[in-house]
């Protein structure tokens, strides 16, 4: 396992930040503690960069060059989307929760790589500065093949 702390210390990529696919803010929410405790018991480690992380550009130049969303800190709209998806997990079926979490992470990573889930803060994203929550909802529905891709 390579923790986020180790990645930040040993693998510095200029112009990029480490991004938690499932944000720490959500992991710390009291309502989700039982679910995340179950996830840990099933072997899911939210601090494992390979499982729960990816590099995203933190400069407009790199966002343009790599066509990825700009990451410059907190991203409350992204967090809200992830929170809503996790809240929809089937709490009665412990055996399906790990699968649902892995599917969510895979879908979020893929959508971020396609620049479909903008990480908005006060700074502007050169490709998705006009994106809003509706855009993120459409991308989320595509993750579960509920809408055709464009």
Label for each model-derived stretch:
Residues 1-68, 129, 133-149:
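Betabetaalpha-Me/HNH-type nuclease active-site subdomain
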């Amino acid at each position: 396992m390579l923790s986020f702390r180790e990645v930040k210390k040993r693998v510095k990529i200029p112009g990029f930040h480490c991004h938690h696919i499932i944000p720490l803010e959500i992991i710390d929410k009291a309502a989700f503690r039982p679910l995340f405790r179950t996830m840990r018991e099933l072997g899911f480690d939210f601090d494992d960069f390979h499982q729960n992380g990816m590099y995203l550009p933190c400069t407009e130049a790199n966002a343009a060059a790599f066509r990825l969303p700009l990451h410059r800190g907190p991203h409350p709209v992204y967090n809200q989307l992830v929170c809503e998806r996790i809240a929809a997990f089937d709490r009665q079926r412990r055996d399906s929760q790990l699968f649902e979490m892995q599917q969510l992470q895979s879908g979020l990573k893929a959508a971020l790589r396609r620049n479909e889930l903008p990480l908005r803060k006060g700074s502007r994203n050169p490709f998705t500065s006009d994106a809003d929550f509706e855009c993120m909802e459409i991308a989320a529905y595509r993750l579960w093949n509920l809408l055709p891709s464009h």
